[in-house]
Amino acid sequence: MKAIIVLLMVVTSNADRICTGITSSNSPHVVKTATQGEVNVTGVIPLTTTPTKSHFANLKGTKTRGKLCPKCLNCTDLDVALARPKCTGTIPSAKASILHEVKPVTFGCFPIMHDRTKIRQLPNLLRGYEHIRLSTHNVINAEKAPGGPYKIGTSGSCPNVTNGNGFFATMAWAVPKNDNNKTATNSLTVEVPYICTEGEDQITVWGFHSDNEIQMVKLYGDSKPQKFTSSANGVTTHYVSQIGGFPNQAEDGGLPQSGRIVVDYMVQKSGKTGTITYQRGILLPQKVWCASGRSKVIKGSLPLIGEADCLHEKYGGLNKSKPYYTGEHAKAIGNCPIWVKTPLKLANGTKYRPPAKLLKER
């Protein structure tokens, strides 16, 4: 009988050490469970982090595009997209791109009515492609287009590489060449062929010029509003020019301009022809953009400093230290943590249980 009593005493005195999953030590950790609500445990691993705002960076493992043309000095992305003189150069390929100009504008050249068309979207459209290049050839012969012959207009506000008068390389300002064809005209149509490599999208830039009545008669022989239409890939767009009412505006140190240009673009899929119907003041397409592949685009800011696992619209460049994050929820690209509303913890200890009270000896 004594042997049995001794055995029971051993088992009782060691109970808190041999039962797995239970501890009697104090525990500061509380986790929420699906079945038992809040539970005290002996240890947890935090699964979430709350990022702090940082600068944007290059995405690890891929090329990241900031400016469309990094080597085009004193040029906005819209200058590059329209091929303003001194703003042409190689656009590096990239799998990820930073949208850093919310409302792109041109830095100089001829005054543009930016908000009459979707032209502000052009830089960001180009940014969404992995590979972008400007064609080496003009898409049409502007001098011999319907309604010609034309001379190609230039502006002193668009100095070229030799500091002579120039214009955007994507368009030709078609001005009637002589008095014989400097008259009002019915609508004319020109076909815009596909000249890119098969499989590429062709982005064709075009537009029109308008001025006050005196200048319209002087340049085109017609002071009435002119009509313009573009059509490509099932999308048709119509415009009517505005005559006069523009204050003189100087661009990039050039002479004050009483006229304005409206610029638009159309996307031609592989092998597809586009059309432009026009009257006087047409800016005929010339060099076109050939683009392929896809680049992930995210809103951000420049310069890009260093590298990061993830690019987040609100926090900039993030390195993934935890699988989840709390804070502001926004678009992110790369190897990013997942947004959660509240912090998550992984219990890696045991369930806490207060120590058993010893029975008093009788």
From Swiss-Prot:
Provide the record's note on post-translational modification. In natural infection, inactive HA is matured into HA1 and HA2 outside the cell by one or more trypsin-like, arginine-specific endoprotease secreted by the bronchial epithelial cells. One identified protease that may be involved in this process is secreted in lungs by club cells. Palmitoylated.
- What is its subcellular localisation? Virion membrane; Host apical cell membrane
Q: What gene name is given for the protein in this entry?
A: HA
Q: Subunit structure, briefly?
A: Homotrimer of disulfide-linked HA1-HA2.
Question: What else is noted?
Answer: Major glycoprotein, comprises over 80% of the envelope proteins present in virus particle. The extent of infection into host organism is determined by HA. Influenza viruses bud from the apical surface of polarized epithelial cells (e.g. bronchial epithelial cells) into lumen of lungs and are therefore usually pneumotropic. The reason is that HA is cleaved by tryptase clara which is restricted to lungs. However, HAs of H5 and H7 pantropic avian viruses subtypes can be cleaved by furin and subtilisin-type enzymes, allowing the virus to grow in other organs than lungs.
KW NAD (keyword) present: no
**What's the main place this protein lives?**
virion
Sorted alphabetically, the Gene Ontology cellular component annotations on this record are: host cell plasma membrane; membrane; viral envelope; virion membrane
Per its UniProt record, what Pfam families does this chain match? Hemagglutinin
UniProt-listed GO biological process terms: fusion of virus membrane with host endosome membrane; fusion of virus membrane with host plasma membrane; symbiont entry into host cell; virion attachment to host cell
Q: How does it sit in the membrane?
A: Single-pass type I membrane protein
Query: What family does this belong to?
Result: Belongs to the influenza viruses hemagglutinin family.
Name the record gives this protein: Hemagglutinin
Question: Which Gene3D superfamilies does the record cross-reference, listed alphabetically?
Answer: 3.90.209.20, Hemagglutinin Chain A, Domain 2
Q: Which GO terms describe its molecular function?
A: host cell surface receptor binding
Q: List the taxonomic lineage.
A: Viruses, Riboviria, Orthornavirae, Negarnaviricota, Polyploviricotina
The residue range of the signal peptide is: 1-15
Q: What's its job?
A: Binds to sialic acid-containing receptors on the cell surface, bringing about the attachment of the virus particle to the cell. Plays a major role in the determination of host range restriction and virulence. Class I viral fusion protein. Responsible for penetration of the virus into the cell cytoplasm by mediating the fusion of the membrane of the endocytosed virus particle with the endosomal membrane. Low pH in endosomes induce an irreversible conformational change in HA2, releasing the fusion hydrophobic peptide. Several trimers are required to form a competent fusion pore.
Taxonomic source organism: Influenza B virus (strain B/Victoria/19/1989)
Q: Which UniProt keywords apply?
A: Disulfide bond, Fusion of virus membrane with host endosomal membrane, Fusion of virus membrane with host membrane, Glycoprotein, Hemagglutinin, Host cell membrane, Host membrane, Host-virus interaction, Lipoprotein, Membrane, Palmitate, Signal, Transmembrane, Viral attachment to host cell, Viral envelope protein, Viral penetration into host cytoplasm, Virion, Virus entry into host cell
Glycan attachment sites: 40, 74, 160, 181, 319, 348
Database matches in InterPro entries:
Capsid_hemagglutn (IPR008980), Hemagglutn_HA1_a/b_dom_sf (IPR013828), Hemagglutn_influenz_A/B (IPR001364)
